[in-house]
């Protein structure tokens, strides 16, 4: 049967019909001798013809040149398709490619060969996101901790100093690990510098912890008690979270003031950070003025995205405040429960000591010990409620205030642009009136002056439009990054919080199961 079949000539210009080869069993038995007698082709012959001809930039079926016999197609059928073939180059170079250094080639090539219905822009957009994620991962290779609070000085001149430790592999820093001492006003000074640089152009600057005059006064003049120790620990944890959020921002991380704060052993004294100073009063006045201006500005919002986001953040702010109040009440409830449990344990122990029945006395003593352990569990859970959940809500209430702040700056930018347009219109109207007036002796000089003013205000209008478009673009990007971080933070904290609850309940079960035999032993 194989002898009767003659292979068609390869130069007849017809594409290979693989349906005619289905019954050719002898094709496969002759491949070994064919391979031995034929030199290897410089180009891979294992590419299917339909894959090559599917692309308009690739060679036509008539241009596919096999070595000696078409049986070589099947002889190499077990080899993998080479993605480095020159015949594949037109497919990959038909469109401009973004920078794909961090991404392996298979992530870009494989989908385009196997799934022709997928459009190239989708692949490139997805690769760009992957590149950005990997780049962000490298940028955020930095760990910051705030520890060792230490009281420096005596009386009202005393202050708390904290050790800020940084571990990083970023080349922008001189060392991979370093630590410095910073006081609370240094943190406030850092935030003030960053806010003055980046807030008005649309960047969300994480807010620093708020001052507490009452709490710090207790630390300065009072003795070390539980309330002052708790206040210092709360502030230490808040400062640590503030720095961690700040260095996560790729733009803020590049700022020289932040690097100086983390590296420099000595910092210039931060000024204008006192709550009751003249600068503090001026800040309160400016906030009140901004609130009044916000009510008077009537912005015609043409972008539905900004209108929707502003409403979303308003609702989110209200719900977070309600939840924060509920969690604060829960923390107080657990502390009260802990105190009542401790009182119950003390009463049970006293009753056990006065009991004459041996088994009952022993059971009451064991019950008192269990209640003391449960009291400790309630205290630990109250701390978990506060440091895990309540502080997260408090941080995001302040962060949403910062988000609202960039929206307000966008409104101010629009108002500045709008004022420039109104002034330009008035200047043009004045020029038109001047042209109508019949005063040739004064018109030329005035015309030149008004023309210079018009050109100046035209430049201001163009600059205002560019500034408004730029801040809108920046805010869109910042809000997207903020939403990702918010979801990630809440997921992490909720999981840790639930794990702490589960651990507490499991420990409670162990305590009561261990006490149960003592109760049953009463006879």
UniProtKB/Swiss-Prot annotation:
Annotated region described as Membrane-binding amphipathic helix, given as residue ranges: 278-295
Binding-site list for a 1,2-diacyl-sn-glycero-3-phospho-(1D-myo-inositol-3-phosphate): 183, 185, 211, 235
Topology versus the membrane: Peripheral membrane protein
Low complexity bias locations: 27-48, 93-104
UniProt KW keywords: Acetylation, Cell projection, Endosome, Lipid-binding, Membrane, Phosphoprotein, Protein transport, Transport
Domain free text: The BAR domain is able to sense membrane curvature upon dimerization. Membrane remodeling seems to implicate insertion of a N-terminal amphipathic helix (AH) in the membrane.
Subunit (UniProt): Predominantly forms heterodimers with BAR domain-containing sorting nexins SNX5, SNX6 and SNX32; can self-associate to form homodimers. The heterodimers are proposed to self-assemble into helical arrays on the membrane to stabilize and expand local membrane curvature underlying endosomal tubule formation.
Protein name stated in the entry: Sorting nexin-2
